[in-house]
């Protein structure tokens, strides 16, 4: 059986974790947009964004919201039957479709930082095309636990599962710094970060 070609446009931390996990099951490609230098050492091939859109069966959009319009408009002419999976926070599916020139095979998802451990929750926005949602779920279930939610609930999911871990990491980091600044020994400082 031939492996599907999966491409990532943008390669920040979430994309990097997804690439690491999915590279055993799929042929992975990534564009040179927002490349995390660690991606250079992965089992993935670097392509120009337009070439990635032509070659891949599934395209992950993993860029910051402020460049999403530019990315989708740049690949819109290449989209035919590909599944486009968005990891972009705060942009609705209808807006993504508009930015892609009306292309409808787009599924909005929101992963959490736990995808690096294959156990984080991942939200998938419910939509009219169950087959696209099912196809998305098959792929991203390798990254964590999937939950199909009404799209109106995706932003709340993002706030809780996206910002929540970052908040607690900041608290732990602050506690560690306070411990070190107070002259606690390394083991005591480590206890403060637990």
Which residues does each PLM region occupy?
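Non-catalytic terminal and connector segments of soluble metabolic enzymes
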Residues: 9, 17, 47, 54-55, ...
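Residues forming the Rossmann-fold NAD(P)(H) cofactor-binding site
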Residues: 16, 69, 93
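Rossmann-like NAD(P)-binding element
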Residues: 50-79
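Short, conserved loop/helix-junction motifs that constitute active-site signature segments
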Residues: 75-81, 99-102
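ADP-ribose/adenylate-binding Rossmann-like module
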Residues: 79-92
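Internal alpha-helical scaffold of NAD(P)-dependent oxidoreductase catalytic cores
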Residues: 95-105, 121-157, 167-194
């Amino acid at each position: 059986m031939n492996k599907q070609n999966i491409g990532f446009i943008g390669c920040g931390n979430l994309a990097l974790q997804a690439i690491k996990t999915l590279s055993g099951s799929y042929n992975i490609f990534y564009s040179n947009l927002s490349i995390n230098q660690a991606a250079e050492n992965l089992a993935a091939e670097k392509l120009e964004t337009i070439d990635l859109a032509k070659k891949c069966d599934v395209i992950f959009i993993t860029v910051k919201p402020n460049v999403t319009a530019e990315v989708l408009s740049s690949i819109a002419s290449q989209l035919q039957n590909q599944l486009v999976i968005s990891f972009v926070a705060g942009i609705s599916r209808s807006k993504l479709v508009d930015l892609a020139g009306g292309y409808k095979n787009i599924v909005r998802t929101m992963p959490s930082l736990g995808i690096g451990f294959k156990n984080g929750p991942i939200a998938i926005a419910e939509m009219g095309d169950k087959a696209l949602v099912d196809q998305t779920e098959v792929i991203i279930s390798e990254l964590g636990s999937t939950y199909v939610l009404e799209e109106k609930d995706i932003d709340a999911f993002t706030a809780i599962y996206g910002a929540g871990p970052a908040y607690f990491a900041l608290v732990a980091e602050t506690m560690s710094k306070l411990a070190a600044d107070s002259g606690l020994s390394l083991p005591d400082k480590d206890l403060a970060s637990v």
